[in-house]
Amino acid sequence: MLTAITGINWGDEGKGRMVDLISQEYDIVARYQGGNNAGHTVKNERGKFVLNLLPSGILRPDVVCVMGNGMVIDPHHLDGEINKLREQGISITPANLKISDRATITMPYHVDQDGLEEARLSKTGAQFGSTKRGIAYTYGDKYMKKTLRMGDLLHLDDSVHKRLVTMVDSKNLVMEGSYNAAPISVDEMWAWLEKYAAIFKDYICDVGQYLADADAAGKKVLFEAQLGALRDIDFGIYPYTTSSNTIGAYAPIGAGIPGHKLTNSVGVMKAYSSCVGDGPFVTELAMTEEEKHALREAGHEYGAATGRPRRVGPIDLVASRYGVFCQGCDEVALTLLDVLDYMEKIPMVTAYKLSDGTTTTRFPMGEALDTAQPVVEYLPGWHCDITAARKWEDLPKEAQNYVEYLEKAVGCKITYISVGAEREAYIHHVV
């Protein structure tokens, strides 16, 4: 069984929390794209955990975690993340963590270039809101065949050294010529690679074969996405996207088993909207600054990876319907419903008014999206604490009505509803 858990919106939907919940039913959890540019926050009986690179299944002792070939991995960050979790009592060994030999390495100069370019763009207001983790530059070099992969750490021989020299020479033309930065040292980069080769050599393997064998043996595999459909490099709000494919259809490819097909796709959707970074975000126009501040504080909307305040707004049903379509969702997990407890009436963006005066429920692109205005409708709020609810019947009628409205609006059944940060604070809603 191959299941993908993906984001329906801009990311930060609560995928890590849902993976932590659902992974108890699975043998393997695999990340298939992205790097340490976004974070998954999981709170359970053992504490609060922030994960950037590691799959959320790492918090379950009986689950094997896989980092697939579609990922870009900063070994320095990964080492720190592993050590932090070990300090929190989480066991991480080659037995429960396997890293693809085909995953691309984020080098220190990728991170440096990201920061330098964002600083350059910010002078003219043209920045993208990068997390400055080197993600775009790693993926860019991957497609130009100018970087190394984790498998190269297993044989740091003369051929790898020659490739490194060529890559550094090419990168220095940019670093010195465009940014007037200090040149990159081949010797320093080689020492850096040797350090992390020693740390990760026992974790690196052919994860594609591992997953194929596991699937053939009847093991259950859960694919974990980073970010959401609206950040996908092809189907997201370009150019305000990430540099990888966040959609579930890419999961088997990015994990290492490209010939396999998903059995089930679970899309994760917030009960309201949030976004980190620049680009059009129509729903934020539906609230006053005071209303947005109240929602941000109620939802603790600050980036797990960056700490930046997230942009917020009502749930955007135009964007969410498009996200469900992109992800091919069979079911939806609705998160953070309890955040809306304080609202007397619940706003929803149900359509966009375009600059030509027309109204649409289809998600537009380009200039049409840039200038779109939200059409807002309201449902009565429940205005009470729902964090103790564990069954559908425990929810106030107003909360039930809201969930049912969302189901019809996005065209997909909602089977999970989270009503709190703790692991057990959810409702499994099967009709």
Region spans (language model):
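Non-transmembrane, aqueous-exposed alpha-helical and coiled segments at domain scale
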Residues: M1-V431
